[in-house]
């Protein structure tokens, strides 16, 4: 099957927003218009709308699907969903990684909100071009120009309106196009009847003023336009559109549009802007990666002629087809039934069926081309962030960084039947979400789940109940502490048992030294002359790894330690792997006496937004929670405080902040790094763990 849409006519976009800005409704309306109405003004039978909703209820995944394909104005638009909540930053990161452009949805009453800032910052880091859609223009208190101002004040974004609203709140009835200088008036609430007419007299002056500002802002990004502008020559609409497109793709300019997705106003014009101003895969730099055989950096331009290279960005379990791996093709062509190399894992994978999610159905396709986004069925070893490439032209694309989980809960199945189901459910959820970990406590047999925050774990436990029908009791959230050594030491581990039958004998000398932060455990074999036979050395390493899973102070996993095995002895008959494993664990226990073991705790970067009057309270909250303030900035009448605070001190803070600020304060936190806990706190943690 030949390529249906050229690369120039392909758009891969995401819809990003703060939690309640109306992202889902916007996505839903986009799918609704692109799936059913190919040009504005087509009448639309009620029946088709019904099928669409039924289909959605039956599967419930259309809107939340990782990637949906739609068509608009002769272009293919792939929409990648991004969640708005901070606990799901990995979802946002992984979607930004495979996007070429994005639509940032604002609530036009609130403008830029804290989570908009987080997502905007991440999009800037990834260099993603954006257009802004000020939604909810029909809402009480909606104020388009205030929203535009918040883009300047809070994000320092060079954002300018390319539209103005006609009316607001209940009177919101149309949109002025500042490029064509025409008014689009809506005559019904379906958004299907639009009259294009001259700008109403009372709006003309404002429209001319904002068109002038728009031309000036765009001219500043382009020398040729600037010359024309300064010489007083007229800039044509075509030149203006080309200038906006170039500046938007270079992430120097952000066009702002308005509308109400709920009332079906402005969505089609926003889709026109996606086509006009956001990049195709040809407009962005070629993706870079490393050749695993030569370690040389290579790039893959977006072209069907290049060797196949793709990035898996999400795993989902679908009730109808099983495990789906969503991937973005950067170069080359892939046919279903073919084999690819997962270069991240070094494993060969067979691509079973290839599916594309359409606005309201799934379609099985034979071939995917460069720039496409699709889902494959049948991949066994591939997880989020893995590269899939041609077996003859291997490349490892830059992966998606996965943050370490910082909070954990104990989950306990309510019945024996639940126990078996829970194991399967947790395994599937962990496959889908790399920031979610499942561990079993060796001593107690309890199952512990770990994730990025309380909401993250709540959602996963809820999914376990709803999707997998598992009933479980859930413990209170706990902090994921770590342990390490802060000093170097040498220790002997000697294990000998001789009481009838075959004896046991293992003897090792190990030097322990602190490792760099984040480097984990490293083992070095420095045995000379065979004092410990080669076949027992892996057993020594294994013995250390197993013992370090339950650390020496309070049973938390040990990290960032180097161990060098440098001496020992053995017995011809009695030595065994088991004996050397035990000897290694005894050496670790012995080392703990002199290696200054320490407990580490997760430190969160907390951003607190509160009214200026409450600044004193907020500073007090940070200090009382063993935190340290990193910086402050004023935002209108609010203050934003950035601070590092231990996660252990942040439980229940939402309630404290709410009552101190009469509900006007908000905060967000993300994991930043691990730090030693103070001695007094360390003693409490040890006491608590020994007492249990």
From Swiss-Prot:
The UniProt GO MF terms for this protein read: GTP binding; GTPase activity; translation elongation factor activity
One GO biological process term: ribosome disassembly
Task: Please give the chief subcellular localization of this protein.
Answer: cytoplasm
Binding of GTP, residues: 17-24, 81-85, 135-138
Domain (tr-type G): residue spans on this chain: 8-282
InterPro entries to which the protein is assigned, alphabetical: EFG_II (IPR041095), EFG_III (IPR009022), EFG_III/V (IPR035647), EFG_IV (IPR047872), EFG_V (IPR035649), EFG_V-like (IPR000640), EFTu-like_2 (IPR004161), G_TR_CS (IPR031157)
Which family is it part of? Belongs to the TRAFAC class translation factor GTPase superfamily. Classic translation factor GTPase family. EF-G/EF-2 subfamily.
Annotated compartments:
Cytoplasm
The task this protein performs is described as: Catalyzes the GTP-dependent ribosomal translocation step during translation elongation. During this step, the ribosome changes from the pre-translocational (PRE) to the post-translocational (POST) state as the newly formed A-site-bound peptidyl-tRNA and P-site-bound deacylated tRNA move to the P and E sites, respectively. Catalyzes the coordinated movement of the two tRNA molecules, the mRNA and conformational changes in the ribosome.
Species whose genome carries this gene: Streptococcus equi subsp. equi (strain 4047)
An annotated GO cellular component: cytoplasm
Q: Which UniProt keywords apply?
A: Cytoplasm, Elongation factor, GTP-binding, Nucleotide-binding, Protein biosynthesis
Its protein name is: Elongation factor G
Q: Does the keyword Calcium apply?
A: no
């Amino acid at each position: 099957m030949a390529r249906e849409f050229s690369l120039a006519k392909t758009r891969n976009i995401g819809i990003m927003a703060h939690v309640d800005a109306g992202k889902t409704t916007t996505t839903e309306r986009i799918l609704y218009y692109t799936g059913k109405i190919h040009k504005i003004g087509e009448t639309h039978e009620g029946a088709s709308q019904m099928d669409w909703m039924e289909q959605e209820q039956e599967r419930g995944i259309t809107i939340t699907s990782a990637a949906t394909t739609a068509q608009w104005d002769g272009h293919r638009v792939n929409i990648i969903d991004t969640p708005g909540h901070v606990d799901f930053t990995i979802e946002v990161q992984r979607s930004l990684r495979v996007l070429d452009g994005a639509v940032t949805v604002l609530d036009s009453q609130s403008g830029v909100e804290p989570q908009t800032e987080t997502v905007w910052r991440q999009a800037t880091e990834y260099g993603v071009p954006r257009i802004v859609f000020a939604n909810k223009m029909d809402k009480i208190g909606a104020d388009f120009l205030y929203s535009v101002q918040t883009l300047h004040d809070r994000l320092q974004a060079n954002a300018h309106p390319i539209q103005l609203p006609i009316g607001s709140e209940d009177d919101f009835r149309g949109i002025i196009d500042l490029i064509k200088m025409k008014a689009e008036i809506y005559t019904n609430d379906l958004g299907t009847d639009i009259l294009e007419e001259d700008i109403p007299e009372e709006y003309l002056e404002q429209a001319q003023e904002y068109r002038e500002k728009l031309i000036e802002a765009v001219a500043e990004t382009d020398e040729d336009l600037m010359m024309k502008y300064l010489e007083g020559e007229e800039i044509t609409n075509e030149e203006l559109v080309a200038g906006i497109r170039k500046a938007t793709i270079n992430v120097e300019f952000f066009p702002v549009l308005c509308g109400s997705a709920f009332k079906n106003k402005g969505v089609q014009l926003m889709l026109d802007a996606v086509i006009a101003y956001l990049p195709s895969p040809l407009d962005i730099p070629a993706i870079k990666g490393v050749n695993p055989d030569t370690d040389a950096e290579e790039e893959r331009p977006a072209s069907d002629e290049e060797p196949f290279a793709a990035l898996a960005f999400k795993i989902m379990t679908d009730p109808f087809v099983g495990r789906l791996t969503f991937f973005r093709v950067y170069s080359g062509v892939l046919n279903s039934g073919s084999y690819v190399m997962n270069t991240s894992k070094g494993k060969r994978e067979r691509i079973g069926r290839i599916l594309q999610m359409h606005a309201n159905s799934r379609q099985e396709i034979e071939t995917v081309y460069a720039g496409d986004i699709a889902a494959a069925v049948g991949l066994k070893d591939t997880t989020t962030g893995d590269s899939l490439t041609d077996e003859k032209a291997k490349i490892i694309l830059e992966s998606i960084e996965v943050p370490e989980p910082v909070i954990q809960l104990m989950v306990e199945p309510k019945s024996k039947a639940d126990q078996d189901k829970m194991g399967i459910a947790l395994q599937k959820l962990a496959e889908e979400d790399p920031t979610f970990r499942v561990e079993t406590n060796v001593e107690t047999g309890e199952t512990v789940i770990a994730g990025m925050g309380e909401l993250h774990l709540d959602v996963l436990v809820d999914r376990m109940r709803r999707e997998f029908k598992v009933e479980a009791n859930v413990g209170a959230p706990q902090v994921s502490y770590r342990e390490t050594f802060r000093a170097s030491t040498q220790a002997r581990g000697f294990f000998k048992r001789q009481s009838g039958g075959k004896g046991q004998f293992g003897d090792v000398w190990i030097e322990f030294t602190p490792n760099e932060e984040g480097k984990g455990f490293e083992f070095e074999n420095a045995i000379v002359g065979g004092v410990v036979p080669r076949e027992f050395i892996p057993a020594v390493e294994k013995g250390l790894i197993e013992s370090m899973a339950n650390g020496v102070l309070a049973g938390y996993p040990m990290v960032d330690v180097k161990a060098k095995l440098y001496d020992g002895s053995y017995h011809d008959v009695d030595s065994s792997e088991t004996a050397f494993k035990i000897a290694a664990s005894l050496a670790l226990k012995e080392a703990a006496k002199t290696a200054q073991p320490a407990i580490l705790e997760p430190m969160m970067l907390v951003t607190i937004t509160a009214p200026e009057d409450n600044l004193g309270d907020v500073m007090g909250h940070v200090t009382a929670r063993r935190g340290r303030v990193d910086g402050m900035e004023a935002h209108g009448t609010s203050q934003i405080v950035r601070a590092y605070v231990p996660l252990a001190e942040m439980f229940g803070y939402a309630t404290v902040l709410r009552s101190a600020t009469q509900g006007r304060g908000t905060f967000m936190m993300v994991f930043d790094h691990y730090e030693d806990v103070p001695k007094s706190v360390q003693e409490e943690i040890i006491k608590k763990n020994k007492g249990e």
